[in-house]
Amino acid sequence: MSIISTKYLLQDAQAKGYAVPAFNIHNAETIQAILEVCSEMRSPVILAGTPGTFKHIALEEIYALCSAYSISYDMPLALHLDHHESLDDIRRKVNAGVRSAMIDGSHFPFEQNVTLVKSVVDFCHLNDCSVEAELGRLGGMEDDMSVDAESAFLTDPQEAKRFVELTGVDSLAVAIGTAHGLYTKRPKIDFQRLAEIRDVVDIPLVLHGASDVPDEFVRRTIELGVCKVNVATELKIAFSAAVKEWFNENPQGNDPRFYMRVGMDAMKEVVKNKINVCGSANKLVLDSAVVL
């Protein structure tokens, strides 16, 4: 098995009407917890790391872990650069073996976003690396980046059409009412806007900020063309809450093998639910056209 591009995973999801879950990773334990479930449920998966992730643990170390797990779990893995903002940073990581990258220029004006994304697409496509970009801007907290409500804005369908045509990007993250992190009130998802984007854009669409969104809302977005669902905050909360509870019950405890496993098991329950919501169970493809 190997580290692969997300392009083929998302094309299969688009053709068959499901979504591939993209789970944010932080260390060996989070990777292992995710893959234990995905292997058991035979679900394709995208392991996403933000720039902050790669400051915590070097790309080369994460890549080595993912390569080893791909063999031991007998499944191809997509290691994805989530919310990266620099061509130079992406270039270095693609040269190290990564085959999936998100370039986030959503904070720039439209034309500047296009220019940045096009430069990344031109480089990545020469290296069999798929590219995701974002148009519109989600509010909330992602990594060490905070976007307030006044700075967030939704994706315009006609701009999305033009953006995809100008950049040649492989997948598009859209802003339709979700936000990074947890919600203080029930989110208002603009399903009509999503449908209008789907009508004019033929590449896979991506839902960011899916943590804490009602399952029925996520399923509806998949029906309307979302092929990749990002989950981060719910995983961290489940892991951390379980570890805190373990220490409350075992105040003298000090063995990471015990409390890490408790955290991993709690995270696994979230992963199972998200796979069921995405409809990706038993969708793992091992065909040579997918595994590069």
From Swiss-Prot:
<feature type="binding site">
    <location>
        <position position="83"/>
    </location>
    <ligand>
        <name>Zn(2+)</name>
    </ligand>
</feature>
<feature type="binding site">
    <location>
        <position position="180"/>
    </location>
    <ligand>
        <name>Zn(2+)</name>
    </ligand>
</feature>
<keyword id="KW-0479">Metal-binding</keyword>
<dbReference type="GO" id="GO:0005829">
    <property type="term" value="C:cytosol"/>
</dbReference>
<comment type="pathway">
    <text>Carbohydrate metabolism; D-tagatose 6-phosphate degradation; D-glyceraldehyde 3-phosphate and glycerone phosphate from D-tagatose 6-phosphate: step 2/2.</text>
</comment>
<dbReference type="GO" id="GO:2001059">
    <property type="term" value="P:D-tagatose 6-phosphate catabolic process"/>
</dbReference>
<keyword id="KW-0456">Lyase</keyword>
<feature type="binding site">
    <location>
        <position position="208"/>
    </location>
    <ligand>
        <name>Zn(2+)</name>
    </ligand>
</feature>
<comment type="function">
    <text>Catalytic subunit of the tagatose-1,6-bisphosphate aldolase KbaYZ, which catalyzes the reversible aldol condensation of dihydroxyacetone phosphate (DHAP or glycerone-phosphate) with glyceraldehyde 3-phosphate (G3P) to produce tagatose 1,6-bisphosphate (TBP). Requires KbaZ subunit for full activity and stability.</text>
</comment>
<dbReference type="InterPro" id="IPR050246">
    <property type="entry name" value="Class_II_FBP_aldolase"/>
</dbReference>
<dbReference type="GO" id="GO:0005975">
    <property type="term" value="P:carbohydrate metabolic process"/>
</dbReference>
<dbReference type="InterPro" id="IPR011288">
    <property type="entry name" value="TagBP_ald_KbaY/GatY"/>
</dbReference>
<comment type="subunit">
    <text>Homotetramer. Forms a complex with KbaZ.</text>
</comment>
<feature type="binding site">
    <location>
        <begin position="209"/>
        <end position="211"/>
    </location>
    <ligand>
        <name>dihydroxyacetone phosphate</name>
    </ligand>
</feature>
<dbReference type="InterPro" id="IPR013785">
    <property type="entry name" value="Aldolase_TIM"/>
</dbReference>
<dbReference type="GO" id="GO:0008270">
    <property type="term" value="F:zinc ion binding"/>
</dbReference>
<feature type="binding site">
    <location>
        <begin position="230"/>
        <end position="233"/>
    </location>
    <ligand>
        <name>dihydroxyacetone phosphate</name>
    </ligand>
</feature>
<dbReference type="Pfam" id="PF01116">
    <property type="entry name" value="F_bP_aldolase"/>
</dbReference>
<feature type="binding site">
    <location>
        <position position="181"/>
    </location>
    <ligand>
        <name>dihydroxyacetone phosphate</name>
    </ligand>
</feature>
<comment type="similarity">
    <text>Belongs to the class II fructose-bisphosphate aldolase family. TagBP aldolase KbaY subfamily.</text>
</comment>
<feature type="active site" description="Proton donor">
    <location>
        <position position="82"/>
    </location>
</feature>
<dbReference type="InterPro" id="IPR000771">
    <property type="entry name" value="FBA_II"/>
</dbReference>
<keyword id="KW-0862">Zinc</keyword>
<protein>
    <recommendedName>
        <fullName>D-tagatose-1,6-bisphosphate aldolase subunit KbaY</fullName>
        <ecNumber>4.1.2.40</ecNumber>
    </recommendedName>
</protein>
<dbReference type="InterPro" id="IPR023788">
    <property type="entry name" value="TagBP_ald_KbaY"/>
</dbReference>
<dbReference type="GO" id="GO:0009025">
    <property type="term" value="F:tagatose-bisphosphate aldolase activity"/>
</dbReference>
